[in-house]
Design a protein with these regions (language model features):
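Active-site-proximal alpha-helix that buttresses catalytic centers in soluble enzyme cores
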Residues: 2-64
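Generic beta-sheet signal
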Residues: 3, 43, 134-144
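Conserved histidine-centered catalytic loops in small-molecule metabolism enzymes
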Residues: 40-71, 96, 152, 175-207
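Short beta-strand scaffold positions
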Residues: 47-48, 117, 141-142
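Alpha-helix capping/helix-boundary segments
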Residues: 52-53, 122, 146-147
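Phosphate-handling substructures
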Residues: 60-120
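GST superfamily/GST-like fold recognition
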Residues: 144-148, 177
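Domain-level recognition of soluble alpha/beta enzyme cores
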Residues: 157-185
């Protein structure tokens, strides 16, 4: 079974390097205009409930049914949301969080390990259900944090968490099968993908 694990398009918060987390930030005008229809047409896309993910799914896969999965929402960055690292460089809570390698709980937010466990449990259930139904394709559109959590835990070859951050409006094409998934819950990374007009034009040009 092929699995597409994708990230939403660009928002103003992305451009401004702000933590958006569970704030329901829409795509920016430039982010929407950059997107294009994907080169395949799934019948269903499993999406985060966040507006930016649903907007992206609608443009990439206009004919697909969107199934909202609450557990796919981004990490809750608590009081850090809406701000960027420059604005928080003298914030003692932020400095302590960075000093912990971003492993401690965000004030009024989530701990990274808890977020990863949540994301991976939801992802594994979607894979289990798709394989049980005999599906040949699973499409998930969520967030950068979702990608990094899932890829670090399940993807081959092995890489560190932050090494798996995919591009906006893109991510990874993966492959697994019932035997491999049942044995060790792994999937093979086949390609990095992106569904923007520029990326698709380069692909068509053979770049």
């Amino acid at each position: 079974m092929n699995i597409y694990l994708l990230r939403h398009g660009t928002t103003d918060y992305n451009t401004q390097h702000r933590y958006q987390g569970q704030r329901d930030i829409p795509l920016s005008t430039a982010g929407r205009q950059a997107l294009c229809r994907a080169d395949f047409d799934p019948d269903v896309v499993f999406v985060s409930p966040m507006t930016r993910a649903r907007q992206t799914a609608h443009i990439l896969f206009p004919d697909a049914e969107q199934v909202v999965v609450p557990g796919l929402r981004e990490m809750d960055f608590g009081t850090f949301e809406g701000r960027n690292y420059v604005e928080m460089e003298n914030d003692p809570d932020y400095r302590a969080w960075v000093a912990s390698n971003c492993e401690s709980a965000c004030p009024d937010g989530e701990r990274k390990d808890d977020f990863c466990d949540r994301s991976c449990a939801v992802f594994a259930k979607l894979v289990d259900d798709a394989l049980a139904a005999g599906r040949r394709q699973l499409v998930i559109l969520a967030h950068g944090g979702t990608q990094m959590s899932v890829m670090e835990r399940f993807a081959l070859p092995r890489k560190e968490y932050h090494d798996w951050l995919g591009p906006n409006a893109g991510g990874y094409l993966l492959e697994t099968d019932p035997e491999t998934w049942a044995k060790d819950h792994t999937m093979r990374c086949l390609a990095k993908v992106q569904y923007t007009k520029d990326a698709m034009a380069k692909r068509e040009a053979g770049c």
